[in-house]
């Protein structure tokens, strides 16, 4: 039995994606530590912000009764995001981080998104410290890359010559999807340093799923199922009526007669909300789009406010922000799920994509844009009520296409200091080929034009007919899928995403520090003598992500 302590680092633990992952991950490893021959003495959540930490410790960490693991938190503002609009004392921040690290010597470090460029000082201090202290073991878990659609973040790290991905034997890189795992290896990180660690999903106890499957076909279960179905219909009707009553005066295009398509996300640019809105207007007689949360960061608030205004003006049928307190008491997510007929996503960039897994667990049909992060677990959607579409096209006048092309050229040339001329020219040619056609992939349009198209679809019958005709194959499939009962294989999902599966992989990573002779014999590296080797991984990642789908104007930081 190995005894360990874990220090879990992130910029913040505010409600959201990475926080959910961290909570589920901690619950996983506490529950299954002994099964994997580990004893966890202590886990510390270490953050740049105190907000929400007490709530996590008191209410969201689920310790088994026999667990002796101590759970606590520590806060130091040196870990927080560094704002771009003021001068900060880099030396002062560095000293604080080093003092913090000294407190947690002897712990396994589990650091999330350390390299994102949101706090470049933290990135540098982490990688320097790990290179100089080869007894300090660290799992560096990557959810997002600065090399992917974040040129300002990446440029700052690159210009400062910061090491981003050191190749040293006391580090393991954890990727949350198969594409990212593949990219890290292709970029030059040794295979045995890179591990695929899918985000854990709660509610996937294999034992309980097996028990449920055993009684599924019994007579008692059959009778109970009919009773449950009636109760579910009543609950759905009641939840839908409450939502309509609460929001019909705020959102004039909300249509009580149409289906509810749930998009359970924050309103941020990469979620490409307005494409889902377009689908809500051209699919059959239309459906209500339900978007749960606003965007909150400075970079996303403008986009969030624009989408909010589109709902309020009636450009988009449905409800926006029902999970926030903007319009009064927030509606619990369970109530919104109960009211919904299917789950929809038009996201153009995801790390994991919880909504896809959740749609199955909620027994809701799924309509989603295809993303390459799905390549590792696409088999769980086989024979389910799920439809993956590639793109939605709309007619765009030549003068607008020429204007958009220039916007792309200006945006892509921002990479000129960090990308070679050949790569820049190739990207420009690819974008030009996308925009020379009379009909254009909606997700490549700037936000202002997306809004104009939504308004035109509402007001111009001829244009609406053209858009419907262009996308008829897709909308016909959507109409079929959303009326299909959701079926899935729960045991297959559990194999990928259960707490037990996550814990087994996590502890296997920890064992690899001691068990892998190949890695144990890796030469020690030093930041000052091996700069070129350290830079090549990041440079290769930049090339892998330098593709039109990651250069969309929607992802632009300006």
Question: Which role fits each region the language model picked out?
Answer:
Residues 7, 211-216, 221, 232, ...:
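Conserved donor-binding/catalytic core segment of Leloir-type glycosyltransferases
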Residues 88, 97-122, 137-141:
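Short N-terminal targeting/anchoring amphipathic segment
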Residues 14-15, 31-89, 97, 116, ...:
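N-terminal strand-loop element at the rim of the active site
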Residues 155-193, 201-208, 512:
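A short, active-site helix/loop in glycosyltransferases that binds the activated sugar's phosphate group
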Residues 1-59, 130-136, 500-507, 511, ...:
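N-terminal subdomain of nucleotide-sugar transferases
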Residues 348:
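Aromatic "clamp/platform" in nucleotide-sugar-dependent glycosyltransferases that forms part
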Residues 303-336, 381-393:
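Nucleotide-activated donor-binding/catalytic signature segment of Leloir-type glycosyltransferases, i.e.
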């Amino acid at each position: 039995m190995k005894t360990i302590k874990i220090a879990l680092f992130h910029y913040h633990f505010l409600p959201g994606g990475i926080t959910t992952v961290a909570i589920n991950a901690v619950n996983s490893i506490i529950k299954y530590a002994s099964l994997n021959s580990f004893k966890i003495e202590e886990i510390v959540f270490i953050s740049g912000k105190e907000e929400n930490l007490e709530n996590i410790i008191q209410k969201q960490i689920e310790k088994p009764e026999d667990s002796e693991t101590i759970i606590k938190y520590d806060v130091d503002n040196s870990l927080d995001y560094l704002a771009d609009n003021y001068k900060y004392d880099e030396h002062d921040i560095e000293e604080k981080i080093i003092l913090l690290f000294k407190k947690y010597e002897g712990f396994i470090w589990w650091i999330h998104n350390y390299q994102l460029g949101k706090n470049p000082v933290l990135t540098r201090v982490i990688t320097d410290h790990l290179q100089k202290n080869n007894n300090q073991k660290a799992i560096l878990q990557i959810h997002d890359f600065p090399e992917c659609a974040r040129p300002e973040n990446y440029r700052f790290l690159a210009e400062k010559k910061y090491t981003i991905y050191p190749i040293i034997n006391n580090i393991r890189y954890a990727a949350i999807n198969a594409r990212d795992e593949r990219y890290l290896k292709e970029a030059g990180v040794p295979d045995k340093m890179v591990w695929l660690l899918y985000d854990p999903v709660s509610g996937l106890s294999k034992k309980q799923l097996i028990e449920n499957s055993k009684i599924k076909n019994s007579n008692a279960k059959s009778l109970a199922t009919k009773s449950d179905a009636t109760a579910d219909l009543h609950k759905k009707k009641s939840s839908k009526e409450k939502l309509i009553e609460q929001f019909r005066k705020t959102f004039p295009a909300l249509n009580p007669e149409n289906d509810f398509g749930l998009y359970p996300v924050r309103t941020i640019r990469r979620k490409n909300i307005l494409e889902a809105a377009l689908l809500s207007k051209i699919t059959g007689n239309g459906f209500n789009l339900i978007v749960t949360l606003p965007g909150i960061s400075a970079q996303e608030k403008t986009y969030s406010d624009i989408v909010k205004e589109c709902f309020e003006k009636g450009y988009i049928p449905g409800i926006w922000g029902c999970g926030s307190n903007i319009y009064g008491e927030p509606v619990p997510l369970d109530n919104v799920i109960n009211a919904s007929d299917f789950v929809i996503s038009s996201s153009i960039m995801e790390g994991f994509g919880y909504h896809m897994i959740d749609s199955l667990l909620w027994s809701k049909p799924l309509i989603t844009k295809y993303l390459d992060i799905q390549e590792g677990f696409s088999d769980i959607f086989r024979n389910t009520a799920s439809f993956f579409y590639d793109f939605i096209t709309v007619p765009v006048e030549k003068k607008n296409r020429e204007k958009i092309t220039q916007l792309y050229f200006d945006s892509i040339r921002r990479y000129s200091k960090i990308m070679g001329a050949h790569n820049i020219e190739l990207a420009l040619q690819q974008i030009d080929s996308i925009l020379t056609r009379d009909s254009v992939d909606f997700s490549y349009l700037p936000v202002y034009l997306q809004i104009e198209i939504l308004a035109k679809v509402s007001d111009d019958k001829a244009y609406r007919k053209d858009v419907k005709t262009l996308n008829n194959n897709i909308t016909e499939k959507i109409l079929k899928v959303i009326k299909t009962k959701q079926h899935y294989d729960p045991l297959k999902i559990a194999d990928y995403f259960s707490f037990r599966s996550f814990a087994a992989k996590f502890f296997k990573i920890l064992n690899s520090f001691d068990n892998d002779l190949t890695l144990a014999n890796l030469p020690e590296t030093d930041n000052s003598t091996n700069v070129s080797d350290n830079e090549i991984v990041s440079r290769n990642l930049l090339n892998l992500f330098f593709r039109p789908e990651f250069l969309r104007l929607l992802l632009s930081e300006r």
